[in-house]
Amino acid sequence: EAFLLADELGFSEAYVGEHVTDAAENITSCAMFVASLAAETKQIRLGTGTVNLPNSHPAHVADQVAMLDHMLDGRLNFGISPGGLASDAEVFGTLDNNRNEMFLEGIDTVLKIWESEAPYNIEGKYWKVTTERTSLTDIGQGIMAKPLQKPHPPIVVTAVAPFSKGVTEAAARGWEPISANFLMPQWVKTHWPKYVEGCHRVGRPADPANWRVAKSVFVADDLATAKEYA
């Protein structure tokens, strides 16, 4: 209901996260949730907020996100992160892995799938994507979907650490940051100069409109009610 109201009110974007081991945040697939809103929203851009890349095979992510972009007629923002919930990592068997390394390999593999033509042969440390043994391209077998937006939906990356080097690297790759909602304001503001640094490195403008900041907001009829819930 909140997403539908935001669409009616003219909000520009809305994001939804995912966790598989959190009763308080019980949306287990942000892509599935966004897909459920495709036909009911008209103008708002919808974002995965975020796909936790170490928890899914890159081929599955690439295929789902490509289809979702078509379902939304190009209104998708592709939000990604390494995932911050330890119990999610444990349930997927990645708790002791270098999840930042998995994150980078995951998004690089997704982008290679979208950039490549079948048959695929993409091999990394954690995943391998290939259709070389079974590809029959003349009948469409072994060909993966590509997103509607070219070269791909806008990529948005979570920023958690103060003075995040990841923000700089993301900006240099053409991606946009979204500062996490649990950061204190003095740490959130450190992300902007790091974003500017990354943009300047590749000669792209650093537009404040592309810097997203997540905050927890509680709306009530009066302040007393809000404080009671808090």
Regions found by a protein language model. Name each.
Residues 6, 10, 18, 37, ...:
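Conserved, mostly hydrophobic/aromatic
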Residues 26-32, 184-195:
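Active-site-adjacent beta->alpha loops and helix N-cap segments on the catalytic face
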Residues 41-44, 199-206:
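Short helix-capping segments at alpha-helix termini
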Residues 50-55:
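The substrate-binding groove and active-site-proximal loops of carbohydrate-active enzymes
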Residues 57-173, 186-190, 200-201:
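Internal, glycine-rich beta/alpha segment that forms the wall or movable "lid"
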